[in-house]
């Protein structure tokens, strides 16, 4: 594989356009921006995000080869490691778990996005650090891929980005932080971030569909800039929510 650092700007753009056009991974994906836009935002040095990239590839393969992918929520690296040892193929990191007992604020919050925006990425990083340590231990014992008793600890992590903690720029930056931490998949919901409520609570407020889609586009742009095929999941509370900031956007969908 050719390193991005050895390609000119024009070659990087051409290679990215070719990947989008020919790679089955991107079939049906509409971005709303160009390869030139992505390359312009990358800078001259492209940093590799191996855990996020390989995790996304694993998760995509699971989604397309398994009837369903069973996961459990993990608050700590040890919990995630035990889940992998028990046979789970992916890890889920929920925002309500982080709100309740694993946020950067050291508080116990309700599921209303009250915790600091860096909280979920930090837990993702801790889980991947545990996976890395477990892998180092078995490697030091002479166990590698294909050997008896070898366990692939690097299960892909799907992380909760809530409603993006703000607007499109906030979603862009949060997605970057998730990828830097090694998340394989990230989901965003269409609630108003400033009034976010847990799924079973009343008073949920939706944003216009156009705004929700714009956040997803911003998140995909962030992944493209970071050079990872991160799985992007869209969640909606439309079935249960009774309020919306504007009816115009959803009336024209």
What is the predicted function of each stretch?
Residues 12-13, 76:
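A broadly tuned, weak detector of single residues within folded domains
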Residues 3-12:
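Intrinsically disordered, low-complexity regulatory segments in eukaryotic proteins
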Residues 19-62, 71-251:
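Alpha/beta enzyme core
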Residues 1-3, 251-253:
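Short intrinsically disordered, low-complexity coil segments enriched in acidic
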Residues 66-67:
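Active-site "substrate specificity/gating" loop of NAD(P)-dependent dehydrogenases
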